[in-house]
């Protein structure tokens, strides 16, 4: 359960960075 939680946190973190990078490119 803990491992699954950590993996989901990693995925959300990478997704957040990806979206942030995408916004910066548009601007």
Curated annotation (Swiss-Prot):
Keywords: Cyanelle, Plastid
Localization (cell): Plastid, Cyanelle
One GO CC annotation: cyanelle
Presence of the UniProt keyword Plastid in the record: yes
Main location: plastid
Protein name, per record: Uncharacterized 3.4 kDa protein in atpE-petA intergenic region
Biological source species: Cyanophora paradoxa
Lineage of the species this protein comes from: Eukaryota, Glaucocystophyceae, Cyanophoraceae, Cyanophora
């Amino acid at each position: 359960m803990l491992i699954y939680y950590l993996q989901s946190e990693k995925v959300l973190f990478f997704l957040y960075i990806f979206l942030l990078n995408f916004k910066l490119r548009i601007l």
